[in-house]
Amino acid sequence: MGQKVHPIGMRVGIIRDWDAKWYAEKEYADYLHEDLAIRKFINKELADASVSTIEIERAVNKVIVSLHTAKPGMVIGKGGANVDALRGQLNKLTGKQVHINIIEIKQPDLDAHLVGENIARQLEQRVAFRRAQKQAIQRTMRAGAKGIKTQVSGRLNGADIARAEGYSEGTVPLHTLRADIDYAWEEADTTYGKLGVKVWIYRGEVLPARKNTKGGK
């Protein structure tokens, strides 16, 4: 089952937190559509800023958006011009007060979304799919990952019949719930159609904190 289920969804509430941190009853559908609109808008506006995770929190008439990015300077802009413009556009989109937090990704080679995005952009530039995957695997393992698996699927090299081809290095224990596995999929638009890119990165185990009990038990 661990091979089929989404690795992040399987671990939410165990070692992963939710990307949307709010609760609603009657307004649930409205908030969900608003979240989707916010994510779609940010991904479109900051397509070149290496944005990985977008976290959304809500309070009364206030939305807090946390952007995890490998290029915080590009998001902020000169004197904060870019982030101010983005905040204004999100205020207009939602009709609420939007606060933006920018969190820098220190090691982009350990982020599955950014690794997958890099492979997809190379495929669009006609780099050989085997070479793009192997280079990404080498960079990720050098960055300190315990394991990585990649897969590219579609009309590889313009073949008439679509197929999938992948590579892996190290270990990627998908069944282990305490394993910190980052997963992402991306799309590459080529002259022969779309290619799908999947990336799994194993970053080590997350062990639960031990609770101190009285009497040393």
From Swiss-Prot:
SUPFAM superfamilies (alphabetical): Prokaryotic type KH domain (KH-domain type II), Ribosomal protein S3 C-terminal domain
GO annotation, cellular component aspect: cytosolic small ribosomal subunit
Domain of life the protein comes from: Bacteria
CDD domains noted in UniProt: KH-II_30S_S3
Domain KH type-2 residues, every copy: 38-106
Gene Ontology molecular functions: mRNA binding; rRNA binding; structural constituent of ribosome
Keywords: Ribonucleoprotein, Ribosomal protein, RNA-binding, rRNA-binding
Family statement drawn from the similarity comment of this UniProt entry: Belongs to the universal ribosomal protein uS3 family.
Described purpose of this protein according to its UniProt entry: Binds the lower part of the 30S subunit head. Binds mRNA in the 70S ribosome, positioning it for translation.
Name of the protein described by the UniProt record: Small ribosomal subunit protein uS3
Species this protein is from: Streptococcus pyogenes serotype M1
Gene that this polypeptide is encoded by: rpsC
